A protein has these predicted regions:
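Conserved NAD(P)+-binding/catalytic subdomain of aldehyde/semialdehyde dehydrogenases
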Residues: 175-263
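C-terminal core of ALDH-fold dehydrogenases
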Residues: 318-428
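Flexible, glycine/charged-enriched surface loops at secondary-structure junctions
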Residues: 98-103, 225, 262-267, 287-297, ...
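N-terminal Rossmann-like NAD(P)+-binding subdomain of aldehyde/semialdehyde dehydrogenases
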Residues: 1-119
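A glycine- and small/hydrophobic-rich beta-loop-beta segment
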Residues: 258, 266-337, 341
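Conserved small-residue-rich beta-alpha loop and adjacent elements
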Residues: 103-169
């Protein structure tokens, strides 16, 4: 972990740069798989499942019998945890329901918005180094609340052709419509283009490795919408002399264990706190089953000493972290100054893990500095806003002449005439 003391503001842009992966070599592979799936459907998907996931599949769909078997394999303790998390995620996302009001912008002209769910959405849940069943809840729960008619989930099977039972249990709790045993680029292609088994969807959500991310970006150019661009996961912690170094170290390590390309970023007004956190990280790291992966992630990480709270929050806003933990005495004051972050955790007890699993907020968030322009997944991610307007004859009198003048000055005579004939009719 690299310690940087009092960096000049001219150095900040370089300081907040994330490690960049060269994905140019991925594109040919990704495009080849996507085109094969587009042209050959299920047969291509089954072939790639055997090649990449080493699973020989007779059917891509998860059967009712497999769902029942999965439920019997999940412990009662985990079921209760999933149900609690689902309840909290539901409560928070229910509160985001849109209630559009009709607005009379001028006499005789009424405008309003209507929120309409995206009919078909696709969710990608990685297998990888850990089964992300929590992501099923995060993506499927708001889709169900929004009113999406079809919620399709793809996740890679193991070598025996089985899906992790906790993923299936979470899918059942959250109300997923159809589940398919498909991973990687072929899953993105199947949902983007449709196959004999997999319905074509209108928007794809979910995390994945660099191949999955490249595939999502490729299909988003012409075929389907995606939730957001994404990169490796990250956390930024702002700490002062009152912070608990045990908590801070645990938060940094909880992020570092995601993968070797994850990044942790500590900003502190206290040099002593930085040293305590370093010591505690080394101590806790030895207790982790994924310590080799976490240790490699820490190589990408930075501990930054700043002169005061204002500089701390300014640097954080420049970094635009996916997760921001403010563990200072004045966390509420600093929270008001946050303008760039995916999700913010306030105080000593609000660990990132709470939001990752069960507080109720969504953990599908912009990474890699995308929080400068993107927000995380929320209820609106599954909706479209359609605008309506209604004009009476009084409305024509109110805006008709202005519309004609503006259209004429843009040299769009047909536009002008569409309003002019109505102005003439009302004026009779």
């Amino acid at each position: 972990m690299k310690v940087i003391c009092y960096p000049a503001k001219e150095e900040w842009d370089e300081l907040v740069k994330r490690p960049r992966l060269d994905v140019s070599e991925l594109n040919a592979t990704v495009e080849g798989v996507l085109n094969d799936v587009k042209n050959h459907g299920d047969s291509a998907v089954i072939r790639y499942e055997e090649k990449f996931d080493h699973a020989h599949l007779d059917s891509l769909s998860v059967s009712d019998a497999e769902m029942e078997e999965a439920e019997s394999l999940v412990s009662l303790e985990l079921k209760h945890a999933l149900e609690l998390a689902h309840h909290n995620i539901s409560s928070f996302h229910q509160s985001q329901q849109f209630h559009g009001e009709k607005v009379e912008t001028v006499s005789g002209v009424t405008c309003w918005q209507k929120s309409v769910a995206i009919e078909k959405v696709g969710l990608y849940i990685p297998g990888g180094t850990a089964p992300l069943f929590s992501t099923v809840l995060m993506l499927a729960t708001p889709a169900k609340i929004a009113g999406c008619k079809e919620i399709v989930l793809c996740t890679p099977p193991n070598r025996e052709g089985k899906v992790n039972p906790a993923i299936l249990m979470a899918a059942k709790i959250a109300g997923v419509s159809k589940i398919f045993k498909i991973g990687g680029v072929q899953a993105i292609g199947a949902m983007a283009y449709g196959t004999e088994s997999v319905p074509k969807v209108y928007k794809i959500f979910g995390p994945g490795n660099q191949y999955v991310m490249a595939a999502k970006q490729h299909v988003s150019l012409h075929d389907v919408a995606i939730d957001m661009p994404a990169g490796p996961s990250e956390v930024c912690v702002i700490a002062d002399e009152t912070s608990n170094p045990v908590f801070v170290a645990a938060d940094l390590l909880s992020q570092a264990e995601h993968g070797v390309d994850s990044q942790v970023f500590l900003i502190s007004t206290s040099e002593e706190m930085i040293e305590k956190v370093k010591e505690e990280v080394e101590k806790q790291l030895e207790q982790l089953p994924r310590k080799e992966m976490a240790a490699k992630s820490l190589d990408n990480s930075k501990l930054v000493l700043v002169k005061d709270y204002d500089e701390a929050i300014e640097l954080s806003n420049t970094y635009a972290p996916e997760h921001l933990i403010i563990a200072t005495r004045n966390y509420d004051e600093l929270a008001e100054k946050v303008v760039n972050a995916g999700s913010v955790f306030l105080g000593q007890y609000a660990c990132e893990s709470a939001g990752d699993y069960a507080s109720g907020t969504n953990h599908t968030l912009p990474t890699h500095g995308y929080a400068l322009a993107y927000n995380g997944v929320n209820l609106d991610s599954y909706n479209r806003k359609i605008t309506f307007q209604h004009l009476t004859d009084e409305g024509i009198r109110s805006i008709g002449n202005a519309v004609v003048v503006m259209a004429e000055n843009e040299q769009l005579e047909a536009h002008a005439n569409a309003m002019r004939v109505r102005v003439n009719e009302v004026g009779k």
